[in-house]
Amino acid sequence: NIGGVGATLAAKIDTSATGGVWGGAVTSAVYYLVTSASGSTQITGNGGSGRSVAHVWEITGYNSSTPTATATAQNTDNTSFSKTISLSTQYNGCTIGSGMTEDTSPAGSVTVSNSDQIVQIDLESATNHYTWKDEGTSLGTTNYLCNQNNPASNLNAGSTIQQLAAAHWK
């Protein structure tokens, strides 16, 4: 809830990974709320069991109240630390993405190509939870390569899970 109003799910992935990477059925999701609230706004909710993180972006100046495109992706390659998520983007639009992978060393080592800003946190020497924003997008398909870069203690040393969700607005 944001300001007492429930947010709407745009994109979500919560299925177990296969192919030899860590098979955790962890959730990565993007929710949104169109609001006229200003100033301090309370955000409440229950993250469920285990490690939970909520990142919040405020985006303004866009015409679409609902996403024009959404996508999810998951790494199942047991020789890879990265995964690309692709979605249809509009000229001068905005993409918000969410990702979860195993933790990095040093902390905060995840990168996302084509993003303007990334926010991330490593928790309990186990998982990295991150989000990115890409404003001023081009018309067409935009690819976001999400890379763990510096693995810390991956359950499978040669790969990592990447649980990715993204939504785009114009």
Feature map (PLM): residue ranges:
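Primarily extracytoplasmic/secreted proteins
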Residues: 1-170
